[in-house]
């Protein structure tokens, strides 16, 4: 097994090479172990995922690990942007947010991004501790973990509407809707599908939103990677 190495926000790996069900399970157990040992509030976690290959399935796998050790888990019902998960962690007062995503990397990658109760990246010491746990676990220990009865409470959530309401409370949306502008919106086959349209939608609005790459495709065709840089726009 390749060594699991954490970067600034979490761990990323090549799908089917080192980012596998076995390694995701080991990493998930290590995160769960850290939460049980270090976070005394036990306020639950939120698990999200993006539109990449297997992201939803990996999110379900990690959720089951958390449940098996008694961690209440909120699992999103659709691919969700990381800032939305972060906002939901704060509003619900959860211990942590875990997102299955490789951010702007190309289609061959996936990853596990972590956010603390304040919506921030975990500090280096915390990540080092989880990394150390990840590389000390064996496959047999993970199998034993799945043999237990689920003990945590699973709640499925859809945080999109609440997040859009938060944005509306921060911006003069009614004035923006009167601006009579046309917006070209590139969703890059990702998690923002429908967000801008929903935010600005109103029968009296004069804004036109023209969206492209407005469907899920984990291959991210015609772009190098899902990142708003000049070569992709």
Regions of interest found by a model, annotated:
Residues 1, 14, 110-233:
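Gly/Ser/Thr-enriched, mixed-charge loops and adjacent short helices
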Residues 1-28:
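Positively charged, low-complexity intrinsically disordered leader regions
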Residues 11, 50-52, 117:
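Short strand-loop junctions, especially beta-strand C-caps/beta-turns
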Residues 23-30, 84, 163-166, 233:
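Well-ordered alpha-helical segments embedded in enzymatic catalytic cores
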Residues 28-45, 142-145, 172-178:
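Glycine-rich phosphate/diphosphate-binding loops that line cofactor/substrate pockets in enzymes
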Residues 33, 46-109, 198-233:
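N-terminal small/polar loop signature for handling phosphorylated ligands or for N-terminal nucleophile
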Residues 40-50, 182-185:
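Short glycine-rich phosphate-binding loop at a beta-alpha junction
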């Amino acid at each position: 097994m390749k060594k699991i190495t954490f970067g600034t926000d979490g761990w990323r790996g090549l799908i089917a090479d080192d980012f596998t069900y076995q390694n995701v399970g080991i990493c998930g157990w290590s995160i769960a172990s850290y939460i049980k040992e270090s976070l005394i509030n036990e306020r639950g976690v939120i698990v999200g995922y993006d539109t990449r290959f297997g992201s939803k399935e990996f999110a379900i796998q990690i959720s089951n690990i958390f449940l098996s050790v008694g961690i209440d888990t909120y699992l999103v019902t659709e691919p969700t942007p990381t800032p939305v998960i972060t906002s939901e962690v704060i509003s619900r007062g959860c211990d942590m947010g875990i997102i299955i995503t490789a951010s702007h990397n190309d289609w061959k990658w996936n990853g596990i991004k972590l956010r603390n109760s304040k919506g921030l990246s975990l500090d280096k010491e915390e990540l080092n501790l989880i990394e150390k746990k990840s590389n000390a676990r064996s496959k047999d220990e993970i199998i034993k973990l799945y043999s237990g009865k689920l003990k945590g409470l699973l709640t499925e959530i859809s945080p999109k509407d609440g997040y859009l309401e938060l944005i509306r409370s921060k911006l003069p949306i009614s004035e923006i809707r009167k601006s009579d502008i046309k917006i070209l919106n590139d969703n890059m086959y990702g998690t923002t599908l429908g967000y801008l349209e929903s935010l600005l939608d109103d029968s009296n609005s004069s804004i036109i939103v023209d969206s492209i790459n407005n469907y899920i495709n984990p291959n991210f065709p015609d772009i190098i990677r899902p990142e708003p840089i000049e070569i992709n726009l």
